[in-house]
Amino acid sequence: MVIKAQSPAGFAEEYIIESIWNNRFPPGSILPAERELSELIGVTRTTLREVLQRLARDGWLTIQHGKPTKVNNFWETSGLNILETLARLDHDSVPQLIDNLLSVRTNISTIFIRTAFRQHPDKALAVLDSAREVEDHADAFAELDYNIFRGLAFASGNPIYGLILNGMKGLYTRIGRHYFSSPEARSLALGFYHQLAKVCEAGLHDQVYELVRRYGHDSGEIWHRMQKSLPGDLAMNMR
C-alpha cells in the first residue's frame, strides 16, 4: 500500500479507505478498536476519531455509539462525492467509470434541459449565452461545459438535478480538461450549445431528447479515440 498524504488525518483517511477497497477491512466487518487502529496507523486517537466521523459522513463506515464501527458496502451507502476516490483507487477501471459518468449525464440532461426550456426559457438562454465568449483552450471549455450543464440543471426548477451535477464536478471537470484538449471536441461542443439555443428560442422542446442523445454519441466517439492517450495522472492526482 503506497499512500501519499500531507497530514496525519489525510494519511489515516487514505489508509482506511484503501484498506476497505483492498478488503483488509471488508464490507460488513468491524473496524479494530480505536486504540488498536490508532497505533496501527500511527496517529492520535483524536485524529482518528475525526477521520472516522468524516468517513462515516461519506458512507464508508457506520458509527454506532457503544458499539464497534462497522464497514459499509460503499456502493450502497456512499454518494457521488466518492467518484474521484474510486478513480484513484482503481486506475484500470477509470475508463469504465468515466463511460458510466458520461452516460448518466446524457440520460438525466435529456430530462432537465427539456424542462428548463419549457418552464424557464429565459434562464436557459442566459446559461447558453455564456458560450459566446469562451476562450479557445481546454481549461476554459472544461469549465464552460460543466457550468452549462449545471446551469441548465438548476434552470429546470428542480435543484436535485443541480446537486447531482455538483457531485460530479471533480471528476467531470478533470475529464473535461483532457477531452477538450481536442479542437474537434471544442468545435462539436460549440455547435451543440448553438443548436440548443436555437431549439430553446423556437420552443421546440421535443427536439431536445434527440439533440442531447446525438451529442452524447458523437462526443463519446471522440472520447473513446482519446482514451488511448489518457494521462496516467488523471486519477493519481485526485485527492
Swiss-Prot record:
GO terms for biological process: fatty acid metabolic process; regulation of fatty acid metabolic process. Its main location: cytoplasm. Residues 6-74 form the HTH gntR-type domain. Signal peptide: none annotated. Homodimer. SMART domains: HTH_GNTR. It is found in: Cytoplasm. Multifunctional regulator of fatty acid metabolism. PROSITE patterns: HTH_GNTR. Residues 34-53 bind DNA. GO terms for cellular component: cytoplasm. It comes from Klebsiella pneumoniae subsp. pneumoniae (strain ATCC 700721 / MGH 78578). Keywords: Activator, Cytoplasm, DNA-binding, Fatty acid metabolism, Lipid metabolism, Repressor, Transcription, Transcription regulation. GO terms for molecular function: DNA binding; DNA-binding transcription factor activity; fatty-acyl-CoA binding. InterPro entries: FA-response_TF_FadR, FadR_C, TF_FadR/GntR_C, Tscrpt_reg_HTH_GntR, WH-like_DNA-bd_sf, WH_DNA-bd_sf. This is Fatty acid metabolism regulator protein. It comes from the Bacteria.
